[in-house]
Design a protein with these regions (language model features):
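N-terminal alpha-helical interaction blocks
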Residues: 1-16
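Glycine-rich phosphate-binding loops at beta-strand->alpha-helix junctions
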Residues: 126-136
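Acidic beta-strand-to-loop metal/phosphate-binding motif
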Residues: 124-127, 182
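PRPP/pyrophosphate-binding module of the type I phosphoribosyltransferase fold
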Residues: 154-251
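Active-site-facing substrate-recognition patch
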Residues: 11, 18-25, 31-123, 146-177, ...
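Conserved strand-to-helix beginnings and helix N-cap segments that scaffold or border functional pockets
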Residues: 95, 136-137, 194-195
Length: 251
């Protein structure tokens, strides 16, 4: 981090490190090759197959994506957290950690997205739950310093499942769209849901879209993840000052 953040963000980041730093791993860069868009470990490619397939559609995609932590499925504590914060039985355990991660990402690094987009004319929205859950959107709303800047979006079509489907989402009638929208999502697996919403926003006239995901999920079904999860991930500590957009210093 190369800029000053509010003291409250610093307090939250330090508390988060103390409480959950033993199992959280910051998304960052290092001496491995990662997809230039979604931070997935790759071998000799600039984009992972999923992001490449998105690009080949010719649809107007998000301009950037940011990630706070890695979550390797199926049994890591971070992966359990990203599933458990939505469940009544485990919510009390995991929701405060997800909330703290969001606080760091939104209050500490929202302005980084604005800087990369080249504008302060920004709004935000949340990828709607296809199951009607409101846990995540409620967390984001509680942390927003600009509630009037929310772009209301609803789920109206089939869930995007690895394939982009901008018809899955609808922007509320009468919304005044800003130049730049930050799309907030809890977890990036294939990126299809968040990217589909980015397409919807761009087709409606938004110039710049930034996607902020709390967790970049690493699947054991992708071979390149296996050595990364085994050898690299355990060496990555949690550092709340890492910018989710650059995976390094703030822009």
């Amino acid at each position: 981090m190369t800029r000053t953040v509010p003291d409250r963000v610093t307090d939250v980041g330090n508390d988060l490190t103390r409480v959950a730093g033993s199992f959280l791993h910051s998304a960052t860069t290092g001496d491995w090759t990662a997809c230039g868009f979604c931070a997935l470990p790759v071998d000799g490619y600039s984009l992972c197959p999923q992001c490449l397939s998105h690009r080949r559609t010719g649809l107007p995609l998000a301009d950037r994506a940011g990630f706070l932590v890695y979550a390797d499925e199926p049994s890591s504590q971070t992966y359990r957290m990203m599933r458990g914060y939505k469940e009544p039985r485990t919510r009390d355990t995991f929701e405060p950690i997800v909330e703290a991660l969001l606080a760091v990402g939104l209050r500490g690094h929202f302005t980084c997205a604005n800087k990369l987009a080249g504008t302060n004319d920004s709004g935000w929205t949340v990828v709607p739950s296809t199951r009607g859950r409101t846990v995540f959107v409620d967390l984001v709303r509680s942390l927003s310093t600009a509630p009037d800047s929310e772009i209301a979006v609803s789920h109206v079509g089939p869930k995007p499942d690895r394939v982009l489907n901008p018809a899955s989402w609808a922007i509320a009638a009468g919304e005044t769209l800003p130049t730049h929208v930050v799309v907030v999502d809890d977890a990036w697996v294939s990126g299809a849901s968040a990217q589909s919403l980015a397409v919807t926003l761009k087709q409606a006239g938004v110039s710049e879209v930034s996607i902020l995901s709390v967790a970049r999920v690493l699947s054991p079904r992708w071979d390149e993840n296996k050595p990364f999860v085994k050898d690299v991930l355990p060496t990555l500590s949690y550092d709340w000052t890492i910018c989710p957009w650059t995976l390094g210093d703030c822009p």
